[in-house]
Structure formats: C-alpha cells, structure tokens
Regions:
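Catalytic core of membrane glycerolipid acyltransferases/transacylases, capturing the structured
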Residues: 118-178, 203-209, 216
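Non-catalytic C-terminal accessory region of glycerolipid acyltransferases
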Residues: 9, 73-76, 114-116, 141-142, ...
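Hydrophobic (often cysteine-bearing) scaffold residues that line and stabilize catalytic clefts
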Residues: 71, 155, 159, 267
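Membrane-anchoring hydrophobic helices of lipid-metabolizing enzymes
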Residues: 2-126, 160-161, 165-166, 171
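Short glycine-/small-residue-rich flexible loop motifs, especially phosphate/cofactor-binding loops
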Residues: 56-57, 136, 164, 208, ...
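Short, composition-biased local secondary-structure segments
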Residues: 24-28, 131-136, 186-199
Length: 302
C-alpha cells in the first residue's frame, strides 16, 4: 500500500514538474518555439525514430502508387509538421485572442451564421489534420453558437486537467465522449454546436461499419451520423488548410442540411471523402503516427 502511494506521489511530482516546464515554454515567443521545433525534428526523426514504422507503413499502404522516394519525402515533411504541432499545442496555454485570430482564419462562416439565424443547432466535424487544436480553440472566438467539443480524456489526470484548461480558455466546452448524449439532452433547448473529430479509431468490439479510405478498409465511428439522424441537425465539415508556419485557414463545407433525407452511412461517407481529398492534396498534415489501421476486418463481422 505504501509503495503504491509512493509511486503515485512520484508520478504526480513528475507530472507537476512537466506541466510547469510546458507552461514556461508556452510563454516563449512563437518564433523561438518554431526554432526549437526545427531542432527537435532531427533527433525525433533520425535518432528516436518516434513511431517511424507506423508512419512508414501507413504511408506505403495509403499511397501504393508512390515511389519509396516520394513516401520518404512525405514522411520527413510530416515529422517537421509534427514537431511544430507539438509546440503550437503547448503555446495554447498562453496565446492571446488577437494572436490566435491572426493565425487561424475562418472562411465562409455565413454557412454557420445562416443556421444560427434560423435558430438551428449544428453538428460539426473535422479530422486530425493541420492543427485541429488551434482550430477548435479559435472557433470559440467566432460568431458560432456555444461549442461543445467531444474528446477522449487522457489517462494522466494532471495532464488531462492541463489540456482541458488550455482548450477551454476562450469559452469552448469540452465533454468526454461517453457524456455526449447526456449533454445533448441537457442542452436541447439551447443553440449549440457539437464538434466531432470523426477520424478516430473505434474500439474493436464496437466496430459497426468499415469504409474505403486511403486505399484501405477502415473501421469508423458512427456517432456523428447517429446523432444527426436523432436530432436532424445540419452537419458541416471544418476543412483546415496550412498556409505557412503557424498560419491556417478553415473552410466550412456543408455535408447535409436535413439528415432525415440522407441514406444510410451517407453522412459518414461524405465526411471521410472530404478528409481523403484534403490528405491527397497535401498529405504531410494528417496524423500519420496514429495506428489508424490496427484493426483487421477479419476480426469483426461488421
């Protein structure tokens, strides 16, 4: 019992020290953080090889038509993006509203604003592409309705709390995936926008649907589509685009205005078609180090 308590205290101590260091890093100028990111790329890619096998396999399977030279070029570009992404995420702890607005621009938000004028709550989705964290943080600075972002909590409580504080600094509300239906019910009379990262991997025994995505049979979550059909809320996609280091633009694209008129899996298929087109156009900015295809369809009869 005492040894378990001691281990817990040591873990919390290391976590607290880590968070203190991250908060310190966050206060540094953005230009200096990008300098550190450029340095971090070399040990991460060439020495540590962080998830390099996963990234390489994902790229090879996703782009069978590309040569190994082309694959490696995308791979290196991804790791450069990933190191910037890590430090941009840390910057969320201190970034000002004005700087975030300057760095993340939303286009054609009139699509959202029209639904708001009509008194309609909205469902929105995006993928783990570019800097989705900055995108969600910047969303709370627009004229969009109250945003509820669905997320998976981190196992470490201290780091989960740190992330939560960063993500909600400007008014967004983050709710754990398991609480989605409860919060939907409790806010049904309010004007809201629920946001989903629709490219997460489902738990093996919960897989219900596979679709073709990046040349592979891919298990996907159906939560967004199920909620859309239950609530008949319009569904939009936030398409993020990298402009230059630290600068992004987000385009809004309608998936459907009336889910009741869609066919089975149409909403899910359309959201993944949009993401696939984005990745094919500029592949380096998706989260390739995630084990997206860890499940085999033979494991599941769905």
């Amino acid at each position: 019992m005492h040894s378990q308590f001691a281990k817990l205290m040591i873990k919390k101590s290391f976590s607290s020290t880590g968070i203190f260091f991250l908060n310190f890093l966050s206060l540094l100028p953005t230009s200096l953080l990008y300098f550190f990111a450029a340095l971090l790329y070399y040990p991460l890619y060439y020495i540590l090889g962080y998830r390099k096998k996963v990234v390489r396999q994902n790229l090879v399977n996703s782009f069978p038509q590309k040569s190994i030279e082309e694959i490696i070029k995308i791979e290196k570009a991804y790791y450069r993006h990933f190191t910037r992404l890590v430090l941009e995420t840390i910057k969320m702890a201190s970034i000002s509203e004005s700087e975030l607005k300057k760095r993340v621009k939303f286009n054609n938000l009139q699509i959202v604003e029209q639904h708001v004028k009509n008194g309609q709550s909205i469902l929105a989705c995006t993928g783990h592409y570019c800097n989705w964290e900055w995108g969600m943080l910047a969303l709370s600075l627009t004229l969009c309705p109250q945003s509820y972002v669905i997320f998976k909590p981190i196992n470490n409580e201290l780091f989960d709390s740190w992330f939560y504080k960063m993500r909600t600094r400007f008014g967004n509300r983050f709710i754990a995936m398991k609480q989605t239906l409860r919060v939907l019910a409790s806010t049904r009379n309010e004007l809201t926008m629920f946001c989903f990262a629709n490219d997460q991997t489902p738990v093996g025994h919960e897989i219900q649907y596979w679709l073709p995505f990046l040349n592979q049979r891919t298990p996907v979550l159906l939560g967004l589509e199920k909620i859309a059909l239950q609530t008949n809320r319009p569904v939009i996609y936030f398409k993020m685009k990298h402009i230059k280091n630290g600068y992004y633009e987000v385009d809004c694209e309608t998936i459907c205005n009336d889910p009741s008129k869609t066919t089975e899996h149409q909403i899910t298929d359309m959201s993944f078609n949009i993401l696939e087109n984005m990745i094919n156009e500029n592949p380096a900015y998706w989260l390739w180090s995630h084990r997206r295809w860890k499940h085999n369809k033979h494991e599941n009869a769905g």
